Regions:
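Glycine/small-residue-rich phosphate/adenosyl-binding loop
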Residues: 1-62
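Generic alpha-helical secondary structure signal
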Residues: 15, 23, 92-96, 108
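Low-complexity, flexible helical/coil segments
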Residues: 19, 80-89, 117-124
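A short, acidic/glycine-rich surface segment
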Residues: 34-35, 96-99, 121-122
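Residue-level signal for pocket-adjacent positions within structured domains
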Residues: 35-36, 93, 129-131
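Solvent-exposed alpha-helices and their adjacent loops that cap or buttress functional pockets
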Residues: 39-42, 102-107
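Small-aliphatic-rich amphipathic alpha-helix that forms the alpha element of a beta-alpha
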Residues: 46-100
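C-terminal helix-cap and adjacent tail motif
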Residues: 104-137
């Protein structure tokens, strides 16, 4: 996590999108240094990053999303929890240094990312729901 925070703090302020992420990262980093509060990855033991090869066409986003969805279902079936991290996706796609740190090529893009681990909270039951009514035509 230290390396990602350092990359964010080294970015150029001339780009308005980068500057938004830089300011947010500064706040996150300050909290992390002051009290160990990791508000980017929440101290999860694993960060999954789904990467797509954009030179193969626009279907990389669909394929990557479907793959992530299947990973999510498998994780839940094993008693694990996930939390998607769109902030990391956006930051990695505007900051080339993050892609470099991850060993990604120019043709690759981060499709999605999520943290994975055992949830702190377990629910014994869910909210009561009405039976779904639908008709196929």
């Amino acid at each position: 996590i230290q390396g990602l925070y350092n990359l964010a703090l080294d970015t150029d302020d001339n780009d308005p999108v980068r500057s938004i992420y830089k300011n947010t990262f500064k706040k996150m980093y300050k909290r992390y240094k002051e009290n160990g509060n990791d508000s980017l990855f929440y101290d999860a033991p694993l960060l999954m990053i789904v990467v797509g090869d954009m030179s193969l066409g626009g279907s990389a986003y669909v394929d990557g999303g479907l793959a992530a969805s299947n990973m999510e279902l498998m994780a839940y079936s094993q008693g694990l929890g996930i939390c998607y991290n769109g902030f990391f996706v956006m930051a990695s796609n505007v900051e080339p240094k993050i892609k470099e740190l991850l060993g990604m090529s120019e043709n690759e893009a981060v499709i999605t990312s999520f943290i994975l681990g055992y949830p702190d909270v377990k629910y014994k039951r869910t909210v009561n729901r009405n039976t779904a009514k639908f008709e196929m035509r």
